[in-house]
């Protein structure tokens, strides 16, 4: 009977270990799109601070994603998206103030 209890507890522990967060595909895609949009308006030139913040958060998020650390990756993908959107908006505003056509 003890071996039966040991098998059941082993099975339960392995099932608990299988519980995980699904890959954050939406957050990944939104961050990637925001990075590309910021790059398209030359945010690296016109909003370098926010661009660097976005790029660094995105780089770290992809590393965590590849390591299947999805909960941490979600936070960084969201941080990257927000920073990239701010960089894009700042770059657009600066370029418009300078009279550039976008």
Where are these regions (language model features)?
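Long, charged/polar, soluble alpha-helical segments
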Residues: 16-102
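Sec-dependent bacterial lipoprotein signal peptides
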Residues: 1-18
């Amino acid at each position: 009977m003890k071996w039966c209890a040991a098998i059941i507890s082993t099975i339960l522990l392995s099932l608990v270990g299988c519980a995980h967060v699904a890959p954050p595909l939406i957050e990944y895609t939104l961050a990637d799109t925001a990075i590309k949009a910021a790059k398209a308006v030359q945010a690296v030139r016109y909003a370098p601070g926010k661009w660097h913040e976005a790029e660094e958060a995105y780089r770290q998020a992809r590393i965590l994603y590849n390591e299947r650390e999805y909960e941490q990756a979600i936070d960084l993908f969201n941080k990257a998206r927000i920073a990239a959107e701010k960089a894009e908006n700042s770059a657009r505003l600066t370029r418009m103030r300078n009279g550039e056509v976008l």
